[in-house]
C-alpha cells in the first residue's frame, strides 16, 4: 500500500521537475529557490573550482556524497521491509483469520474488537506497522535536496560548467544522446532490481516503474543539459549497487532472525496434529467398547 501511494507522488514530482522554469531571472526567487537552489549552486561552484574547474567530477562527487549521507535512512528502510515481510509469512494465518472477522463484523464494536486482536498479533510477532509507514521518510527527506540539485543542473547560473563544460566525451551544458540513453538504461535496471525484492502483490507496481521511470528520465534529459543525464546516471548506478547489496544482506538477516518463530510455529502445528490423531484413536476405541 505504501509503495502504491508513492507512485503518484513520484510521478507528480517528475511533472513538477519538468514544468518549473528558473531560466528567467525574474523567476529566481522564493522559498525553494533560496533554501535549496542557492546552497546547492554554491556547493557545485566550490567543488568545481576545487577540482580545477572539472565540473563533471564535481557533479559525480556531490551525487555520491548526497547518496552516502542518505544511506543510513535507506538501509533502515531495507531492513524494516525485509523483517516485516518475513514476519508476515509467520503471522499470515492469524492476520487472515482476523481480517475474515472484520469482513463478517456487523457492528462498530465487533470491528473494534477485531482491530484490537490485530494489534495483539502485531505485538505477538514484534511487528510495528509504523516502521513500514516510516519507509517513506528517506524519500521525503531527499526530495527537496535532489530537486535543488536538479534545478541547479537544469538551469545553471553564470560561470561554472557553462564556462567549463567538457567532461569525458560530452558537453555538460548541452544535451547528449549517449548519456541520455545510459541514464534511461540505468534507471530501468534500478527499477528492475528494486522490483525483485517486492512482494508478489506489489510487483506489478514495480513493473510499471520499470517502464515509466526510464521514459520520464529520457524525456527530461533529452531536452536538458547533459549534466542532468550525468547526475541521473551516477545516482541510478549507486542505487543499483545499494539495492542489490542491501537486499542480499537484509534478506538473509531477516530469515535468520525469523527462523525461530517459524520453527516454533511448525512445532505447534505438529503438536496440534498429533493431539488430533490421538483424540481420533481414543474415540474409535471407545466406540468399539
From Swiss-Prot:
Segment forming the signal sequence: 1-19
Location relative to the cell: Cell membrane
Lipid tethering residues (S-diacylglycerol cysteine): 20
GO terms under biological process: protein insertion into membrane; protein transport
Main location: membrane
Segments for region (Disordered): 269-289
InterPro entries: YidC/ALB3/OXA1/COX18, YidC/Oxa/ALB_C, YidC/YidC1/YidC2_Firmicutes, YidC_ALB_C
This protein's UniProt keywords: Cell membrane, Chaperone, Lipoprotein, Membrane, Palmitate, Protein transport, Signal, Transmembrane, Transmembrane helix, Transport
Entry GO terms, CC: plasma membrane
TM region positions: 55-75, 133-153, 166-186, 210-230
Single annotated GO MF: membrane insertase activity
Membrane topology reported for the UniProt record: Multi-pass membrane protein
Lipidated positions per record (N-palmitoyl cysteine): 20
Pfam families reported in the protein's UniProt record: 60KD_IMP (PF02096)
HAMAP family: YidC_type2
Function: Required for the insertion and/or proper folding and/or complex formation of integral membrane proteins into the membrane. Involved in integration of membrane proteins that insert both dependently and independently of the Sec translocase complex, as well as at least some lipoproteins.
Family: Belongs to the OXA1/ALB3/YidC family. Type 2 subfamily.
Protein name as it appears in the record: Membrane protein insertase YidC
Gene: yidC
Amino acid at each position: 500500500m505504501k509503495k502504491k501511494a508513492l507512485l503518484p507522488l513520484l510521478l507528480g514530482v517528475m511533472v513538477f521537475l519538468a514544468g518549473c522554469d528558473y531560466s528567467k531571472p525574474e523567476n529566481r526567487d522564493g522559498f525553494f529557490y533560496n533554501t535549496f537552489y542557492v546552497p546547492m549552486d554554491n556547493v557545485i561552484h566550490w567543488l568545481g573550482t576545487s577540482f580545477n574547474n572539472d565540473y563533471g567530477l564535481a557533479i559525480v562527487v556531490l551525487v555520491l556524497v548526497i547518496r552516502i549521507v542518505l544511506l543510513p535512512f535507506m538501509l533502515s528502510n531495507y531492513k524494516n521491509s525485509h523483517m516485516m515481510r518475513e514476519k508476515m509469512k509467520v503471522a499470515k494465518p492469524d492476520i487472515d483469520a482476523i481480517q475474515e472477522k472484520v469482513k463478517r463484523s456487523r457492528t462498530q464494536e465487533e470491528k473494534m474488537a477485531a482491530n484490537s486482536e490485530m494489534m495483539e498479533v502485531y505485538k505477538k510477532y514484534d511487528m510495528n506497522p509504523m516502521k513500514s509507514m516510516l519507509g517513506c521518510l528517506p524519500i521525503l527527506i531527499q526530495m527537496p535536496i535532489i530537486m535543488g540539485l536538479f534545478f541547479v543542473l537544469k538551469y545553471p547560473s553564470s560561470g561554472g560548467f557553462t564556462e567549463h563544460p567538457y567532461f569525458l566525451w560530452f558537453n555538460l551544458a548541452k544535451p547528449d544522446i549517449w548519456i541520455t540513453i545510459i541514464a534511461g538504461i540505468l534507471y530501468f535496471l534500478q527499477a528492475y532490481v528494486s522490483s525483485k525484492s517486492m512482494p508478489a502483490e506489489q510487483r506489478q507496481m514495480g513493473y510499471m516503474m520499470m517502464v515509466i521511470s526510464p521514459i520520464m528520465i529520457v524525456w527530461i534529459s533529452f531536452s536538458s543539459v547533459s549534466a542532468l543525464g550525468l547526475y541521473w546516471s551516477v545516482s541510478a548506478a549507486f542505487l543499483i549497487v545499494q539495492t542489490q547489496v542491501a537486499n542480499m544482506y537484509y534478506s538473509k538477516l531477516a530469515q535468520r532472525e525469523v527462523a525461530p518463530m517459524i520453527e516454533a510455529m511448525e512445532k505447534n502445528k505438529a503438536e496440534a496434529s498429533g493431539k488430533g490423531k490421538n483424540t481420533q484413536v481414543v474415540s474409535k476405541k471407545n466406540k468399539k467398547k
